[in-house]
Amino acid sequence: MPEVDILQYAFMQRALITGIATAIVCGLLSCWITHMGWSLMGDAISHSILPGVVIAHLLGLPYLVGALVFALITVVLVGQVKKSQIVRPDTAIGIVFTTFFALGTVLISKVPSQINLSHILFGNLLGVTTPDMLQVICIGLPIAILLILKNKDLTLLSFDPTQVQAIGLSTKTLTSFLLVALALAIVISLQAVGVILSVSLLIVPGACARLLTNQMRHMLWISPLIATVSVLIGITGSYYLDASSGGMIGLTLGVVFCIIFILKSLTRFTFGHILDKN
């Protein structure tokens, strides 16, 4: 089989640009999500946007619009249930996301439409259109900029919320900002890895970075780098193997984590300390 320059194809160019934009945003967020123990929240939002996607399709709206609405609804509902203190926080999250995900599957099964369920669940980067790519960039770029600008405040929030209040900042405002950013990141990752695997982009890069360094300032460039490299490998692999792009990205992330974990285990006393000394 002769070598083919995959960059000569417009659909591959769109896939790579969309994938990189998504990886950078999710990679940044992953640092705080994993440190604050918000992995389940990310999983909840990613599953809860399914009915929004179906409803948006029925109304002739972009998928991202419906997904964003239900992502924000999920954040609000989980917050209200947690405030009631009647049920445990993890229970509240589980109830909300399973209910919405079930609603989405019912809508897909009962409402006549041309929705490709596999594309929603596992993503379809190779089928991204120019408007889709521009939507991801327009949403992702402001999020990335704001996260970088607020990284010190968010890092302080993740380590010591009491200190945040002591210096006059609002923990509620910062938490709300992070939740909205999380919702938006999951919405744009719908194009890349779909509903089910979007959580992998939000958890694995940060977990890998945490194995390599204990300092957040290093994690904030290592995590997006790992996410970006994994997306590039996943997209390339999906093209040559004719496999699911979302599945290949998720698999690549898993392999990268395993490699770093094994190396960390074998070189426990030296691996990762080089960065932390600088």
Where are these regions (language model features)?
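Transmembrane helix-bundle core of multi-pass membrane transporters
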Residues: 2-14, 85, 89-153, 180
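Helix-loop-helix "hairpin" substructures at the membrane interface of multi-pass membrane proteins
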Residues: 133-205
